[in-house]
């Protein structure tokens, strides 16, 4: 029996969406299928290193561990800076142009995503103690994927 997946709907920003649309057309698949495939590739990397070893570039935690990260790069997953990721998140203007994409996660992946959101402490992502938005984490992982690196925002070069 297959494990049940949890759905998270998200609008990605215009530049990420255009990159996904172009590649989906080349591969002759749906945008959502491609987006899920890319995100799962990055999610596998996150799950391998664990949420504790996922850091935002140039954050206090990153700067305090920079020497360790350089020596053991494979043990860490780096997210682009929050201000960089925010440029690639949908705005209200984008909402009229592009529909949401449904992303699917296993329970243990959702637990990891929740830990990442809580660790990043980005305003408006947690409300009343509950995770309200995964958009910075998901957009950050998409930006790290080799397909989206053409956008120049990746924190990982592996």
What do these predicted regions represent?
Residues 2, 95, 130-132:
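A generic structural micro-feature
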Residues 81, 87-125, 135:
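Conserved small-residue-rich
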Residues 26-55, 125-158:
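Short, basic amphipathic alpha-helical segments that act as recognition/interaction helices
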Residues 45-96, 147-158:
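Short, positively charged interaction helices/loops
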Residues 1-41, 45:
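Helix-turn-helix-like N-terminal two-helix hairpins of bacterial/phage DNA-binding regulators
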Residues 4-21, 58-59, 63-64, 98-118:
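Short amphipathic alpha-helix starts
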